Amino acid sequence: MNSYFEQASGFYGHPHQATGMAMGSGGHHDQTASAAAAAYRGFPLSLGMSPYANHHLQRTTQDSPYDASITAACNKIYGDGASAYKQDCLNIKADAVNGYKDIWNTGGSNGGGTGGGGGGGGAGGNASNGSNAGNAANGQNNAAGGMPVRPSACTPDSRVGGYLDTSGGSPVSHRGGSAGGNVSAGGGGQSGQSGAPGVGVGVGVGVGAGAGTAWNANCTISGAAAAQTAAASSLHQASNHTFYPWMAIAGKIRSDLTQYGGISTDMGKRYSESLAGSLLPDWLGTNGLRRRGRQTYTRYQTLELEKEFHTNHYLTRRRRIEMAHALCLTERQIKIWFQNRRMKLKKEIQAIKELNEQEKQAQAQKAAAAAAAAAAVQGGHLDQN
């Protein structure tokens, strides 16, 4: 495919080879109207650089009847002379730039809202028409002022920003300029994207008087705009996190602790514990973190677990997996249940032992008391004799 474009009769033709590099490196200076029109026609859409691998090679320009017709049309529209196509992004005026009317930076009463579709449809107010041809680089909206409209691309690199809407105000984005807030819809697909005329609907919403902003007023993003973009992205990332009620309570505790800077560590702990005991609900811990709730078992699950525990106090891995599938529980839940059940059994056995010992002690005390009473009775009989 590259070899086809590198041939003498490539798709874009050699006027792009000869003059496209001059536009990318040396700017728009010292070019004839025909060379500028050919380079503007041949510049690939949505590309800020030449797609050719050997773009540094200079080749002879071959004129064709098609180039001649394009040159004549450009001379008729933009006027003759080398200064007709010169543009400078750094010297943008309020109303006109180098003889071209800046419709993107006007907030007057006669500026209609421009279409946001492919080539941009004609808007309300005094905006006349929106043209969208197949090979046109972008739609041209001629205002009623009589002055030719400035082309949309300020530099080859800015066209990429125009289609990607990186500058926030490209012709493709929602920009207007009419005082009455006119809404316009213009036909036409994306301009210059295909060889055939595009079909689509573009909708432009007019902004209030003086509120329209120039989409190409700044070729580079300023430091304030970059900082605002970074702040907006960080805010968007922070909004993705889920907020729970306990976060507000925990944040209140931390803010109260930081408010009193003289509180020592121990005093801060006691203060947080007192707040936790008074403000936090039962299912929240002292540090504001959620405690895991108790697992409730159904009667069927408890019965099956008790039967298995009666058979064997310790489960193998295989048996634990089988019971987990049978009772719709996890292995961890069954493991913890058996641990708790063994601890409960141990406590029960210990309690039984203590009861047995207490009974033995009580029986021993009773036997001792009975023996003492019998001895006392026997001693009394001996004294009487």
From Swiss-Prot:
One BP term from GO: negative regulation of transcription by RNA polymerase II
Q: Does the keyword Nucleus apply?
A: yes
For this UniProt record, the keywords arranged alphabetically read as follows: Activator, Developmental protein, DNA-binding, Homeobox, Nucleus, Repressor, Transcription, Transcription regulation
Kindly state the positions of the motif Antp-type hexapeptide in this protein: 243-248
Q: Which GO terms describe its molecular function?
A: DNA binding; DNA-binding transcription factor activity, RNA polymerase II-specific; RNA polymerase II cis-regulatory region sequence-specific DNA binding
Q: Where in the cell is it found?
A: Nucleus
UniProt DNA-binding region? 290-349
Q: Where is the composition biased (Gly residues)?
A: 177-194
Question: What's the domain of life for this entry?
Answer: Eukaryota
Task: Cite the residue spans of the region called Disordered.
Answer: 132-194
| One Pfam family linked to the record | Homeodomain
- List the record's Gene Ontology CC terms alphabetically: nucleus
Compositional bias of type Low complexity: which residue ranges?
132-146
Instruction: Please describe what this protein does.
Output: Sequence-specific transcription factor which is part of a developmental regulatory system that provides cells with specific positional identities on the anterior-posterior axis. Binds the consensus region 5'-TTAAT[GT][GA]-3'. This homeotic protein controls development of the cells in the posterior thoracic and first abdominal segments. It activates the synthesis of the decapentaplegic (DPP) growth factor.
Q: Which PANTHER family match?
A: HOMEOBOX PROTEIN HOX, HOMEOTIC PROTEIN ULTRABITHORAX
Q: Which family does it belong to?
A: Belongs to the Antp homeobox family.
Q: What is this protein called?
A: Homeotic protein ultrabithorax
UniProt organism field: Drosophila pseudoobscura pseudoobscura (Fruit fly)
